[in-house]
Amino acid sequence: MKNTFFNLSRFTNLCRKNMVEDWRANLLRLLVLYGVMTVILVWYGYIVYHNYKSYSIQYTKTDPVWEFVALAFLWFLFGFGALSASFTMENMKSKASRLSSLMIPATSFEKYFSRWLVSTVVFLFLFLIAFKLADYTRVIIYRFSYPKIEAIEAFPLTGWVDRTSVHYVFVFRKMHMLIFIFALYLYVQSLFVLGSVIWPKNSFLKTFASGSIIAFLYFGTIILLIDMFSDPTLHYDTPLSLWTDAERSALFSVLAVLGALFNWVLGYFRFKESEIIQRM
């Protein structure tokens, strides 16, 4: 190969190859994603609409299920995003699959980037489609089941930050809060991408377990040190306490994005190292 790092034509052929080989597995995962979200949204909608048939809900302008749908979206995003990331290097589980990957005429970066693209960018696109389809399924089912409830509508994703609309349920009052949550999602997702490179087998469980233990020890140590060395009779002002909420959110958002970039880059070098070891 003349270009030993990245070639667009070669990368396109690699993506096409991966898409042809993995389309059945990806389609099955998309159907599972849609099915799980549909079952949960329809189940909660039944609980609300079936037990709440008063005059107020029949003529209200806000769907009473929207608050749950908004929160469920975040849980789905983090949960399924982590699960998708844990499948990034699933083709490296067995010795035969690793040897097959080595035989592909592409650089380590192209192989890693093609897998990262599917588990990160393509997943977000398909997740939004599956979520909207699941929500529209809920709306169709209950508009026929409860025709008197005029407020049954699909949840508008812009309702999180649009403070001018009285019809929307507010999860975040400010845009900077939503940006921070998305940055946090990228960081969490990057941990599972890194875990997939380190542990191709049972990646999700191993990454979740190790991450939980590290987080518990880290925050436990911080709390213990603060409790040991702080004087409860005194009040301490930190530099962050003088910042506005928007400034603090911006800082933590930048740190989360930098952490995600670090994990993605570290995952690439770990993947490249594993390929070198396999060739030896």
What kind of region is each of these model predictions?
Residues 1-99, 108-280:
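Hydrophobic alpha-helical transmembrane segments of membrane proteins
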